[in-house]
From Swiss-Prot:
It comes from Schizosaccharomyces pombe (strain 972 / ATCC 24843). The gene is tim54. Residues 1-12 are mitochondrial matrix. Residues 181-216 are annotated as: Disordered. Its main location: mitochondrion. This is Mitochondrial import inner membrane translocase subunit tim54.
């Protein structure tokens, strides 16, 4: 009988393989199950917000979420983290949000700078029909907030605020964009008149686009004097979520460790999301760079970004909060205290 059973048992090598596969599968299953339980735990903490009554014409609370691709990778990294870990908690709290996606160094900065500039000069970004509709509706009594994922997005947002307060740079940028739009219209007219030169015109257009892109990049890193500071309550409270993204073959052991510990990331992100939903643990902008501003994330970035010749003039690697004028400029900005959220998890 034993000989018969033994004949059906796998050999030594197959047993090792099956044991290895079973161990890996079990670790993944346990981690994903714990991750889902953690997210559900945080959803249950904010679900009562969805049950609160609202006035007939009252708008729900709205957040603005900036999704920006991390250095060396695509926008999908930020998008997947938000969809998997953060969005379920906001949905459970019945919080409305608007996502703004961008990728590439400087793109988010331009969007924020334009929004800040328009707000300072009372330039409305809302169409007339929307204005008429909003005049009838009541704004939410709960405060809005801004959600940023990653150290790179935080840097671009703050530099965007800085450039939005620099009227000279913004006026120059707007004039450049207007000139580019006029040139584009002229080229389209020429292409319509002369079909034979389509290929040459398209090549010229590509070259002009490259040149204009470089000109915009150089204007983004141009030094501008800081005067005064951001007025209190000018910006909504900022929520800073970590976006760990380690690349490279040499970092495989560390990447595998993170892969099997997604539950820890869910715990960290969930605690911050609950603070945002409940509007608690709000603090002033720190006077020095550190953990609260995700300074440790820069060690995960590809080394190629730190070996560039214009290292100190690029947005992601430029000196940050090292000038007293810069610290004073941002000191009226409110942010959610992510370090307090980490402490509350274990209490």
């Amino acid at each position: 009988m034993l000989k018969t059973i033994k004949s059906y048992m796998p050999g030594r090598n197959m047993s090792i393989f099956l044991g290895f596969v079973a161990g890996i599968s079990g670790a993944i299953y346990y981690d994903r199950r714990q991750k889902n339980l953690i997210i559900e735990k945080y959803c249950s903490q904010v679900r009562h917000l969805a049950d609160q009554p609202m006035a007939p014409l009252e708008l729900p609370r709205k957040l603005k979420v900036y999704l920006h691709g991390p250095p060396g990778d695509g926008i999908y990294v930020a998008r997947e983290e938000f969809e998997e870990y953060i969005r379920p908690i906001f949905n459970a709290a019945a919080i409305e949000f608007e996502t703004v996606e961008s990728k590439g160094e400087g793109n988010l900065l331009e969007q924020v700078a334009r929004t800040v500039y328009n707000k300072r000069h009372n330039i409305s970004e809302v169409s007339e029909p929307e204005k008429n509709l909003l005049s009838v509706l009541k704004p939410s009594v709960d405060p809005p907030a801004i959600v940023l994922l990653g150290r790179h997005a935080l840097k671009e947002f703050l530099y965007g605020v800085r450039y939005g307060f620099s009227d000279d740079i913004m006026k120059r940028k707007l004039e450049t964009e207007k000139l580019e739009a006029n040139n584009k219209e002229e080229k389209e007219e020429k292409e319509g008149k002369d079909d034979k030169d389509d290929k040459e015109d398209s090549n010229d257009t590509k070259n002009d686009k490259k040149i204009s892109k470089n000109e915009v990049d150089s204007s983004l890193i141009e030094a501008s004097p800081l005067t005064g500071q951001v007025p209190p309550k000018f910006l909504d409270t900022i929520a800073i979520f970590p976006l760990p993204n380690l690349l490279g073959f040499s970092n495989t052991p560390k990447r595998l460790s993170r892969f099997f510990k997604r539950r820890e990331l869910a715990d960290e992100l969930g605690a911050i999301a609950v603070n945002v939903a409940l509007s608690r643990d709000v603090t002033k902008f720190p006077k020095q760079d550190g953990t609260l501003l995700l300074a440790e994330e820069e060690t995960d970035w590809p080394k190629q970004f730190f070996t560039r010749s214009d290292l100190e003039n690029r947005i992601w690697t430029a000196p940050f909060l090292q000038d007293s004028d810069e610290i004073r400029f941002f000191e009226n900005i409110d942010i959610f205290d992510s370090t307090k959220a980490k402490q509350d998890k274990y209490e």
